[in-house]
Amino acid sequence: YDQDRANVTYPGAMNDLRLEDIDFEFLSSARHMHFANCFMQPGIRNDLTALFRQAKELGLTTSLDTQWDPEEKWELPLEELLPYVDVFLPNMQEFKFLSESNTVEEGINKLKSFAHYIIIKNGSEGALGWDGKDIIVQHAFKNERVIDCVGAGDSFDAGFIKDFIHNLPLKKCLETGALTGAINTTRAGGTGAFENLETTREIALERFNYKL
């Protein structure tokens, strides 16, 4: 698809999920809460701040990947929401629209007073991570035989969060995120490369010369 593609999504229950549907007692047994695709979930979108606040009160670390806004309005109360989000995970286009900025530096300057970690995914250009002070650049792992890019951003999130919840340095979290995002593109369907840990490790070593 190069850098542009279209997805068709059947929302199903996403349209109806409400804050009151969430079992916070069950959530309290988790270490981390990740929320994605909020613009496709109208029933809970306006309660995101309450959801993330509750998760933090329960002692969880948190992350948010807004993903694309199909209506392209980009209306989120970031100043209220991001104080409860440990890791903000938009891609480059989403970040610029959400922060109403033309550059990464401009966007970070707008968000830095109330954001924690800002991680910006940028496709074949890799990713950027801001830790509250410095910007760290992570180059992409190049896959010369791309099968499918669907789910690459989600796979980046998973790899990053896996290291983040183990308190590894931001640079290592970014590296693992970039690797799992690239591994995703070697199989079709968004999850094909992650059938089991052994398969994922084999792909990492054979395709990217990386021991996972």
Q: What role is predicted for each listed range?
A:
Residues 1-35, 201-212:
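Conserved N-terminal subdomain of the carbohydrate kinase-like
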